[in-house]
A protein has these predicted regions:
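Short acidic catalytic loops
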Residues: 297-298, 541-551, 589-595, 656-679
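N-terminal accessory beta-strand-rich subdomains and adjacent acidic, glycine-rich linkers
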Residues: 25-31, 40-485, 864, 868
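Solvent-exposed loop/turn segments at secondary-structure junctions
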Residues: 109-110, 119, 190-192, 304-306, ...
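Active-site-proximal substrate-binding groove within the catalytic cores of carbohydrate-active enzymes
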Residues: 44, 104, 109-116, 377, ...
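Aromatic-lined carbohydrate-binding/catalytic grooves of carbohydrate-active enzymes
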Residues: 492-648
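Conserved, mostly hydrophobic/aromatic
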Residues: 99, 300, 535, 582, ...
Length: 879
């Protein structure tokens, strides 16, 4: 189905006329006509949506730091602590709390943290890297770096520096002590003089006066060969100097007494900016360490980074080697791809690609012509590592939307298992000039705010991914003041049953040979009410209905400048009847709309209001062909609205939705997608978009209940319900085990469900139910009432398995079983998850309940009792 954007109105042209004599009457009439034409032009010109000012992150009223020490602290034995301090002998202690001590090596800038509760020592860099038989000297140096960066050359190519090879060995770093930590300031680049010390441009008079007249004839001739005279300007311009001759020319410059003051004067006189004269790139980057109670904070103030105009900082890796574990260590890396995965140390999977995971997924504002894989998104900006009986969880607190996680195992370039983030300080993209030529483009300004990582440490029985999940849940509760379900007085007794009702789509029809879009009702409001009745008759309660395609033209709706329920579905009265029916059953109606995705050009100015790429093109997105992975330009999907307009659009939607009396709102895209806007008039980097999303969602949450999809971490303070949360990982080759980390964090905080049971590749309801038992998620189906014959000749093949009459009985059966489990653990925290065998897992809850799931085809014995094949068992326990 092809959807064409209606073009903006044209103001027209005026045909040439013959000269004539004008009188006052003619002038008056002409003036009136012009005024009318101008009025019509203003009325029908596409208007840019009004902005609602800048956006700042909401204040959640957090009174204590997330790192504040909780309860009584049990320290390690004096013997253990003595051994730990012996390990850091020769280092200087720079800060301490009741549970952590921070040390620094003043010769190498390496840092170490001692956890006094276990005597575990966490190093920023592996201490035995010199014994690595696989690593080259350069790689050993990189293992000793706390920071690594890439920068852009004038031609768009990238080069890299690391803090060991390009700062520490040159002794161009300083350590500044602070009450709660320290800041290490690195000067990147070769401190020795290079071509930049030779003037790029110099007047004939000054070349003779400052250099040539102070040299003998032989040296003067040598120097003159390095410049060419521009006869038009009378300026000498430096030639390219080969490396073999550079030292000789520098010696002559020094011999003549030409100094930095002279160079600065010549540069200013001839318009040469710093760095334009060549030489090595140089950067100044401050890295701050701070102890915050139980946690270590590591940050870089991007606004304090200094660079040359010629060389621009592109990416920055922060503590990639923190905790790096060697070949003799036991443990794993935790990566948050989708539900979560573990990578066992030294797993030998060097045939597999190392892990590269953009936090919150890829930025859709970048140029893309094909889509090879659709993968589970990183919803939480976290990563971790378990070593022996200790572990850490790292939370990317600031700069999370600009970050990408990297992880790999030993055996590729060196003998260490490692994980860490890379921050894209200055995004770049390819812009095609023609079929063969491309140009690298960047925004005018880089990201200039904080980049911050918070390290949380776990020990003994809390060490591992279960302890990491408990720590992150506690962190979210403190940061966002989230109230557990068990403390919410109005929480329902029954488990939620999530159903997505598909309302109206558009279908191309013809009349007298003219094509037009016609609304096709798939589920009317009354038919959705019938779904509710039939579910209730089968023992399904607490129905949470996400109603998609209910307004302004259906699924691909117009912007909510005005909100009208689709007449073919039953209009406003039908919608309100459905809402009242759901409320009477103890459920909630969530009419869905898209905040950022725009499906047609009504109600906005596509030039001013849409997201632009770095090539200054207003982006349009198309569906991809599943056969060849290429973009299908005949299948338009959507455009993107500038994030700056989110609060305006939300305000308008809520204003009109109030008239429809709905008590919930479902936002289709904001919980799962975040992007930049490179519009020159209003550039917005991805990190700033989070503030606009938060401002808009807070408006909705202040008014009532909010259902979101995907569940990115920054939307959690505003979510009442989450659907399409990640229930599985990507199963990348390098990973070894899939874990329900997302669920472990969320259970007991916000009710959630994964993908619709009938919307996944494997539609075995029993298997989906078993996965829901393991992950603590709820039943979710995406349904329509009409026959799927209505979907023929449309792009909506996603809905071919959605006829609700075919799923009712299985859905109700799955719900009744999960509701029984919900009554036992629905508001409890999921405090432990473990794999007992290949296809047997056990989940433990904060109220002592345990749930064992057997995915296998044969019964298994656990704790002296059988768990039947493809089944589960609930065990009572003590808290």
């Amino acid at each position: 189905m092809k959807i064409s954007l209606r073009k903006s109105r044209d103001s027209g042209t005026v045909a040439p006329t013959r000269r004539r004599k004008w009188n006052w009457k003619t002038i008056s009439i002409a003036g009136a006509i012009i005024a009318v034409l101008l009025l019509l032009f203003v009325l029908f010109q596409p208007r840019s949506l009004p902005r609602m000012g800048d956006a700042a992150m909401p204040d959640f009223g957090v009174s204590t730091s997330p790192g504040a020490i909780k309860g009584t602290v049990a320290l390690a034995s004096s013997t253990q602590l003595s051994a730990a301090r012996q390990e850091v002998a020769g280092l200087e202690r720079v800060a301490a709390t009741d549970v952590l001590e921070l040390f620094v090596n003043k010769s190498t800038a390496e840092a170490a943290v001692i956890d006094l509760r276990s005597a575990a020592v966490w190093w920023t860099n592996p201490q035995d890297r010199d014994q690595d038989g696989m690593a080259s000297p350069l790689i050993k140096g990189k293992l000793g770096a706390q920071l690594s960066l890439t920068y852009l050359m004038p031609n768009g190519q990238t080069k890299d520096y690391d803090s060991f090879n390009d700062s520490v060995i040159h002794k161009t770093f300083t350590i500044q002590s602070e009450p709660d930590g320290m800041t290490v300031v690195y000067e990147f680049g070769n401190p020795e003089r290079g071509a930049e010390a030779i003037p790029l441009k110099i007047s004939k008079q000054r070349l003779e006066e400052k250099i040539l007249n102070k040299l003998d004839q032989k040296d003067r001739n040598q120097m003159l060969t390095r410049f060419r005279l521009n006869e038009d300007t009378g300026i000498y311009e430096r030639r390219e100097i080969p490396k073999s001759a550079l030292k000789k020319v520098l010696d002559l410059i020094e011999k003549a007494g030409y100094n930095e003051e002279d160079l600065k004067s010549d540069n200013e006189q001839n318009g040469v900016v710093e760095g334009e004269g060549g030489g090595s790139a140089s950067f100044t980057v401050p890295l701050r360490y701070k102890l915050d109670g139980e946690h270590l904070l590591v940050s870089v103030d991007a606004s304090a980074i200094k660079s040359q105009p010629t060389y621009r900082l592109h990416t920055l890796d922060v503590l990639s080697s923190f905790g790096a574990a060697g070949k003799k260590e036991n443990g794993y890396l935790f990566v948050p791809d989708g539900s979560g995965s573990l990578i066992y140390f030294n797993n030998g999977k060097n045939y597999a690609q190392g892990l590269v995971l953009p936090v919150y997924g890829e930025d859709p504002s970048f140029f893309k012509t094909e889509q090879l894989n659709t993968y589970e998104t990183v919803r939480m900006p976290i990563y971790g590592m378990k070593r022996g009986t200790s572990s850490f969880l790292a939370v990317i607190e600031d700069g999370d939307a600009m970050s990408t996680l990297y992880a790999d195992v030993s055996g590729r370039q060196h003998e260490y298992n490692w994980i860490g983030p890379q921050f894209t300080v200055l995004p770049k993209d390819k812009v095609m000039l023609n079929a063969r030529e491309e140009l690298i483009k960047t925004p005018a300004e880089p990201y200039a705010e904080q980049l911050q990582i918070r390290y949380m440490f776990q020990n003994r029985e809390e060490a591992g991914y279960s302890g990491m999940a408990n720590a992150y849940r506690d962190y979210l509760m403190r940061k966002y003041q989230l109230k557990p379900l068990r403390e919410q007085a109005d929480k329902p007794a029954d488990a939620p049953f999530y159903v997505e009702a598909i309302g109206s789509i558009s279908k191309v029809k013809t009349f007298l040979g003219v094509s037009y879009d016609s609304p096709v009702p798939l589920t009317t409001f009354d038919e959705a009410g019938q779904m509710v009745k039939e579910l209730a008759a089968r023992g399904v309660f607490n129905i949470q209905m996400n109603y998609a395609g209910w307004m302004n033209g259906g699924i691909q709706h117009k912007l909510p400048n005005n909100v009208k329920a689709v007449r073919e579905l039953g209009g406003r009265d039908g919608l309100n009847r459905l809402r009242e029916q759901l409320q009477a059953q103890g459920g909630t109606l969530y009419p869905e709309f898209s905040l950022g995705r725009v499906y047609n050009d009504d109600g906005w100015n596509a030039t001013k209001d849409s997201v632009q790429s770095l090539g200054r093109i207003s982006l349009k997105f198309f569906r991809f062909n599943a056969a060849n992975f290429k973009k299908n330009v005949e299948a338009f999907s959507h455009s993107l609205l500038s994030p700056a307009l989110y609060p305006t659009v939300m305000s308008r939607y809520l204003e009109h939705a109030e008239l429809l009396a709905d008590d919930g709102v479902s936002v289709q895209d904001s919980g799962s997608e975040i992007y930049s806007n490179f519009n020159l008039n209003e550039p917005i980097l991805r990190q700033k978009s989070i503030a606009f999303v938060s401002k808009a969602l807070k408006q909705a949450a202040d008014r009532g209940k909010v259902m979101l999809q995907g569940g990115n971490a920054y939307v959690l303070p505003y979510a009442s319900q989450i659907i399409r949360a990640p229930m599985q990982s990507n199963r990348f080759q390098i990973t070894d085990e899939m874990i329900p980390f997302y669920s472990m964090v969320m259970h007991g905080l916000i009710p959630y469900a994964g993908e619709a049971f009938n919307g996944v590749e494997n539609q075995d309801v029993n298997k989906r139910m078993l996965q829901a038992v393991e992950t603590g998620s709820n039943v979710f189906f995406s349904w329509l009432a009409a026959s799927t014959e209505q979907l023929r000749d449309t792009m909506w093949d996603d809905f071919f398995a959605a006829e609700y009459s075919q799923w009712l009985d299985e859905a109700a059966s799955a719900y009744r079983q999960l509701n029984e489990l919900h009554h036992k653990v629905g508001d409890a925290f999921m405090i432990k998850h473990e794999r007992l065998a290949d296809e047997v897992v056990q989940t433990t809850y904060s109220n002592g309940m345990r749930v064992i799931v057997n995915y296998g085809n044969a019964p298994v014995q656990v704790g002296g009792a059988a768990v039947e094949a493809a089944n589960y068992r609930i065990e009572e326990g003590s808290k």
